[in-house]
Amino acid sequence: MIKAGIIGATGYAGAELVRILMNHKEVEIAWYGSRSYVDENYADIYGNMFQIVDAKCMDDNMEELAESVDVIFTATPQGFLAGVLTEDILSKVKIVDLSADFRIKDVATYEKWYKIEHKSPQFIDEAVYGLCEINRDKVTKETRLVANPGCYTTCSILTAYPLVKEGLIDTDTLIVDAKSGTSGAGRGAKTPNLFCEVNESMKAYGVASHRHTPEIEEQLGYAAGKEILINFTPHLVPMNRGIIATEYATLKKKPDGTLPTYDEIKAVYDKYYANEKFVRVLKKGVCPETKWVEGSNYVDVNFVIDERTGRIIMMGALDNLVKGAAGQAVQNMNLLFGFDEAEGLNMVPMFP
């Protein structure tokens, strides 16, 4: 049994960490960190935890926390962990960071897109990008710092990764159109996220400027073995949770001048995902739906070949708070400590 501390336990991703870890047989939550609710009962903030969690919220003192737990989850805004992380802290505890502070390897790129100065760039190189299905062999018991991928990025990367890796699409033509529920914007009160602003409406935002763009480009670039530039456009939709990504790219023709067939593309997806518990490649003609993955750690993917245009449409769906945040963080923790990778994550998707 290990002890875990959560900084940001009262945000949506932090609360989802609590929900998941409560059912993990190898973990005890020892620290419910929340700068906003210090000394308040956790169950008073989240009523669904009434008579389940009997603990008060604590502060975000990383130095003290590192002395008392085996792993820290930082479900915090960008800049928090980078601003407090020291070698002394990392020498005592493993950290899974749900922010973007250590996802992007180039400091200048991070500072350009997030518009803040990176306070601890000396730890970027050692941070492992924790997209388990791709970097599983790098998340080991020796790893100290895991950069948990973003929600849009997890969905976008896993949806296209097999075809990028195998060189079956022209990456210069890749377009990612993604839609997310409002929980992706966090729990803080913001006028654009009020019920009357969001209900019965959809909108694009961060057009040509969303900060998950360089993260997607960097990871798919590693897969392709070259620099990649994409068009990424996110949209806000009036639902609580879920992300769906629809991605478009031109298929590369085979030597005989014909397009790859459905069976050939399906074989590529199966090559990468047939043995992945949390990635489900759907049957032919079935399009992913956010409702099918809600509350779970699954990613559903599929594709359609448009022979008329020579393009392929790739689709993916996940729960932004689970596989897009807390579930993936627990998956990484399991790898860090040598637990069964699926421990605590065998949640059946909720429906309806």
Feature roles, as predicted:
Residues 1-200, 205-207, 304-307, 348-352:
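N-terminal Rossmann-like NAD(P) cofactor-binding subdomain of oxidoreductases
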Residues 29, 171-176, 227-231, 278-283, ...:
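A short coil-to-beta-strand element that immediately follows conserved catalytic motifs
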Residues 143, 202, 242-246, 311-313:
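Short, solvent-exposed beta-strand edge segments and adjacent coil->beta transition regions
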Residues 204-208, 235-238, 290-293:
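Short Gly/Pro-enriched turn/cap motifs at secondary-structure boundaries
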Residues 209-232, 236-240, 244-246:
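Oxyanion-binding "anion nests"
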